[in-house]
A protein has these predicted regions:
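Conserved phosphoryl-transfer catalytic core
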Residues: 38-46
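C-terminal-of-GTPase-core extension/linker across diverse P-loop GTPases
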Residues: 47-230
Length: 230
């Protein structure tokens, strides 16, 4: 879940609640997601309770126990992701529940262009609020990104970023943060006709990566020629 928070003052852009408070905005969305998950959990509990307690279904027992822990956390105003999964069976059961608050979260602090590099007091408040959460935070100025998008050449964009004191665009940093949060990386294949990027999960070995290109490449894997590049 990408959670965009307003972290800038601008009298011409009126906030729906009349003031700028990104922590309040975060908590409102958190509550809405938690209430939706609580509704989902209570519905599933009704469905699996009998199977777990009467039918003796092993999978139902695992799911039922996890659902009760999720319910307790959600009723306390916590997200489901704070519940620690005890084994692989619970990990599998959790994935099948599709709860919103078990998903990884990336907080995007949208600041004015003068705060694009270091952030501001609003960003500091968000950082303090998410301590203890398994979440990422990045700072982006949507106005700066809009200005960059209007430039035509790569050189113009790089010069603009340098003038702003930035090493790369917010879009690039957003993509990298998402990849990191989802435990993903990229490898590149190069040939005479094209260069292409492929996504894989961190920790995969070369045969698994080859399978991303084509399943036959994984089955008949021989070797990979690896080239370092900057």
């Amino acid at each position: 879940i990408i959670h965009v928070l307003r972290c800038f003052d601008n009298g011409n852009i009126v906030h729906v609640d009349g003031s700028v408070d990104p922590v309040r905005d975060k908590e409102i969305i958190d509550t809405e997601l938690q209430l939706k998950d609580l509704e989902t959990v209570e519905t599933r509990i009704k469905r699996v309770e009998k199977l777990a307690n009467v039918g003796g279904d092993k999978q139902a027992k695992i799911e039922y126990g996890l659902l009760l822990r999720y319910k307790e956390a959600l009723e306390q105003g916590k997200s489901a992701r704070v519940v620690e999964l005890e084994n692989e069976e619970e990990v599998a059961a959790s994935k099948n529940m599709f709860l919103l608050t078990t998903k990884p979260v990336l907080y995007v602090c949208n600041v004015d262009d003068t705060s694009a590099k270091e952030g501001n007091q609003y960003v500091d408040a968000v950082r303090n609020a998410i301590q203890g959460e398994d979440a990422e935070l990045i700072i982006i100025s949507a106005q700066t990104e809009a200005d960059i998008a209007e430039l035509e050449t790569y050189e113009e964009k790089q010069m603009f970023l340098e003038d702003m004191g930035l090493e790369e665009s917010g879009c690039n940093r957003l993509i990298k943060a998402i990849y990191s949060l989802l435990n993903l990386e990229t490898f590149i294949t190069a040939g005479e006709m094209e260069v292409k990027a492929w996504t894989y999960r961190k920790g995969w070995k070369a045969p698994q990566c080859a399978g991303v290109i084509h399943t036959d490449f994984e089955k008949g894997f021989i070797r990979a020629e690896v080239i370092k590049y900057e």
